[in-house]
Amino acid sequence: MLYIEQSEMMLVPLITVTVVAGTILVCYILYICRKKIRTVYNDNKIIMTKLKKIKSPNSSKSSKSTDSESDWEDHCSAMEQNNDVDNISRNEILNDDSFAGSLIWDNESNIMAPSTEHIYDSVAGSTLLINNDRNEQTIYQNTTVVINDTETVEILNEDTKQIPSYSSNPFVNYNKTSICSKSNPFIAELNNKFSDNNPFRRAHSDDYLNKQQDHEYDDIESSVVSLV
């Protein structure tokens, strides 16, 4: 019994010594490794901060993506509504008896209004419209010019209405009422006084000359210039 008690008394200091020695050893080891531990801790801290920074933009991107998706859906729905409104308005315009809806095609492949006015005339106001059936030419500028087929065209060969112009042309007699100049052989002799000195006049027979003497004041030309 005494031996057991003595052995127990010896174990208590040994246990205490080992515990104290162990703690001292651990503290020494930690003291030696403090730099490494500190570097590891700092590295871990940096890694955690980086991870937090990475997570925050991802979360913002996810929120932005959800917002953009919702915005896109709203945009699509708005576009569909606008298309529906446009279709309804177009149908109403086509069904309405408006100017554009009542346009027709004429025989000349031109767009004509119901009032037989050309579509370009209604827009520009100055385009020329020719109506072949009525033989008239209308300009839509508050001016109407009528051309008739039966309109008499005045003869330019009349003596009293000849306008002297381009006097440098030797082949035309602009003053037919006066006596033909003998110095200009290119002018046709309109009177009966034929000159024998003019080699460019056409030779006439005696019958023709007699007829010309009978009709001295006729307006028909008596000769035509011809070059030999």
From Swiss-Prot:
Q: Which residues carry this modification: Phosphotyrosine?
A: 120, 140
Query: Per the similarity annotation, which family is this?
Result: Belongs to the orthopoxvirus OPG164 protein family.
Q: Which residues lie on this side of the membrane: Cytoplasmic?
A: 31-228
Annotated GO CC locations = host cell plasma membrane; membrane
Report the subcellular localization. Answer: Host cell membrane
Q: How does it assemble?
A: Interacts with host NCK. Interacts with protein OPG161 (via C-terminus). Interacts with protein OPG056. Interacts (via C-terminus) with host kinesin light chain/KLC1. Interacts with host intersectin-1/ITSN1 and EPS15.
Q: Does the keyword Membrane apply?
A: yes
* Keyword Transmembrane helix in annotation: yes
Q: What is this protein called?
A: Protein OPG164
The domain of life is Viruses
